[in-house]
């Protein structure tokens, strides 16, 4: 049994394709796997940064606050926000002559 799905053969009108036994379950399975592989490869190339970042860090968005009182949660949020806020006084301006 041949795994070729199409064979080019000379005909009266030139070269043409003749499909041989395309209803074979092995050929159908190989075609489906090939198409899925192509789709997954394209998605991987389009979204590789997102995919590998998600695999590396998971879905974690920060420490869990389960069981922590609301006052401590608010204090933590304020600390995180103050760490993000930028104070212009910390920068040094360098002027080139």
Curated annotation (Swiss-Prot):
Cytoplasmic tail plays an important role in virion assembly and morphogenesis. Homotetramer; composed of two disulfide-linked dimers held together by non-covalent interactions. May interact with matrix protein 1. This is Matrix protein 2. The gene is M. Forms a proton-selective ion channel that is necessary for the efficient release of the viral genome during virus entry. After attaching to the cell surface, the virion enters the cell by endocytosis. Acidification of the endosome triggers M2 ion channel activity. InterPro entries: Flu_M2 (IPR002089). Belongs to the influenza viruses matrix protein M2 family. Gene3D superfamilies: 6.10.250.1640.
